């Protein structure tokens, strides 16, 4: 049974779900007239995979088990986030709509990838700028903004964009927190995200990721990293409404102070 779960393939799972629904659901559609949808929403509605409540529960359970067995299965983690995060995404939507910056993001729906961001220009910014810090983070950790999986299982395209935005901003959060991508820091960043945005998958990754830490890492985690994440969460502003792309030239320490982020010591 465990070996079978380890071999779960998300593309194969997606095909199974799609084929089982074609006879009952037909092609994907929406009650909103196409002319009232923006480009992201139209594209998403053409590519999403519609699933029933039962299939959502099944996918959530299967992806959670597969994620626990193999934390490197990013496809399963992504699936888990989509099948369990709707209520949290609705709360994030409310938070974003409550701020001018957040509303602008929801209207413009910016994307973060190498087609939309000139990393060379960020590297040319002053060394104390947020844009430079982000470009340096990508280079130092051998990370690309093109690695995020597309959202597929959410019904509402507005929530699909918020989940997309969350995924594409993950490395920006690493950069502003000054946290590399090793396991200890990944768990810490997940705690910060979980306490900040409430997504169940973030809590799951934080809790079960910590279980996989080595003894020495776990001691450091309990003594320094986890208390730092919790303390920051008490004073940190919501991160999802931040239009990071408009902050490239801002001094990174000023941005941290604005957001209520206390540097890790």
Curated annotation (Swiss-Prot):
Compartment annotation: Mitochondrion inner membrane
EC number: 4.1.1.130
Cofactor(s) the record lists: Zn(2+)
Predominant localisation class: mitochondrion
GO cellular component, one term: extrinsic component of mitochondrial inner membrane
The entry's keywords: Lyase, Membrane, Metal-binding, Mitochondrion, Mitochondrion inner membrane, Transit peptide, Ubiquinone biosynthesis, Zinc
Record pathway: Cofactor biosynthesis; ubiquinone biosynthesis
Ligand binding (Zn(2+)): 170-171, 174, 186
GO annotation, biological process: ubiquinone biosynthetic process
InterPro entries with a match to the protein in the record: Coq4, Coq4_euk
Transit peptide: 1-26
Topology of this chain in the membrane: Peripheral membrane protein
Catalysed reactions listed for this entry: a 4-hydroxy-3-methoxy-5-(all-trans-polyprenyl)benzoate + H(+) = a 2-methoxy-6-(all-trans-polyprenyl)phenol + CO2
PANTHER family from the UniProt entry: UBIQUINONE BIOSYNTHESIS PROTEIN (PTHR12922), UBIQUINONE BIOSYNTHESIS PROTEIN COQ4 HOMOLOG, MITOCHONDRIAL (PTHR12922:SF7)
Subunit structure: Component of a multi-subunit COQ enzyme complex.
Function: Lyase that catalyzes the C1-decarboxylation of 4-hydroxy-3-methoxy-5-(all-trans-polyprenyl)benzoic acid into 2-methoxy-6-(all-trans-polyprenyl)phenol during ubiquinone biosynthesis.
Family, similarity comment: Belongs to the COQ4 family.
Name assigned to this protein: Ubiquinone biosynthesis protein COQ4 homolog, mitochondrial
Taxonomic source organism: Drosophila mojavensis (Fruit fly)
């Amino acid at each position: 049974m465990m070996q079978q779960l380890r071999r779960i393939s998300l593309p194969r799972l997606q095909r199974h779900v799609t084929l089982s629904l074609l006879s009952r659901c037909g092609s994907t559609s929406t009650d909103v007239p196409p002319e009232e949808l923006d480009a992201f929403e139209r594209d998403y509605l053409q590519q999403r995979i519609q699933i029933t409540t039962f299939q959502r529960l099944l996918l959530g359970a299967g992806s959670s088990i597969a994620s626990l067995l193999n934390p490197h299965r990013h496809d399963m983690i992504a699936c888990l986030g989509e099948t369990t995060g709707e209520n949290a995404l609705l709360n994030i939507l409310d938070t974003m709509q409550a701020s001018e910056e957040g509303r602008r993001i929801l209207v413009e729906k910016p994307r973060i990838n190498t087609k939309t961001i000139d990393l060379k220009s960020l590297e040319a910014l002053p060394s104390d700028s947020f844009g430079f810090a982000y470009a340096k983070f990508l280079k130092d950790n051998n990370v690309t903004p093109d690695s995020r999986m597309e959202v597929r299982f959410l019904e509402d395209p507005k929530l699909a964009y918020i989940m997309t935005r969350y995924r594409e901003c993950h490395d920006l959060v690493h950069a502003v927190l000054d946290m590399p991508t090793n396991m200890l820091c990944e768990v810490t960043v997940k705690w910060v995200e979980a306490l900040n945005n409430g997504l169940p998958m973030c809590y799951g990754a934080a809790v079960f990721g910590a279980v996989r830490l080595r003894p020495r890492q776990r001691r450091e985690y309990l003594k320094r990293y986890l208390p730092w994440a919790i303390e920051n969460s008490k004073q940190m502003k919501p991160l999802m409404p931040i239009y990071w792309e408009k902050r490239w030239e801002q001094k990174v320490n000023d941005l941290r102070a604005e957001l209520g982020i206390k540097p890790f010591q």
